[in-house]
């Protein structure tokens, strides 16, 4: 799951973290996998949002399900939008995770994409779908 969390004051909740595959620190939306076969995408999104960022939302909606990279695997990404996200103060990272929380005003999103500050494909897809949904 990948979560587009938007706060009441119209900031998007991002995480900044090192990604070994590209050897860079990237600005991306929070996300993660399913804990069990019984967990659905909205439950996984709620759990991952709070674990990675300490934010919670009671207003979640599925935006789309996309193939991650159909050339090499069968992974899918469930894009979830979480409106009215609020900090709960309870971040629960895995022992190997180092995550910085970054709030970006919605009005700055396009500029950050155009300038290459946001360059992860799933994050960009969720942003475009979510911002279209909001307009």
Language-model segments: residues:
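Nudix hydrolase/Nudix homology domain
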Residues: 71, 78, 95-135
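Short, well-ordered beta-strand micro-motif
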Residues: 5, 81-83, 103-105
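A short coil-to-beta-strand element that immediately follows conserved catalytic motifs
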Residues: 56-63
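Active-site-adjacent beta-strand/loop module that shapes the phosphate/pyrophosphate-binding cleft
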Residues: 69-88
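Conserved Nudix-box catalytic region and its N-terminal flanking loop in Nudix hydrolases
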Residues: 1-47, 93-95
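Structural motif
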Residues: 12, 24, 74-79, 99
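Recognition helices and adjacent regulatory flanks at domain boundaries
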Residues: 11, 18-20, 47-51, 55, ...
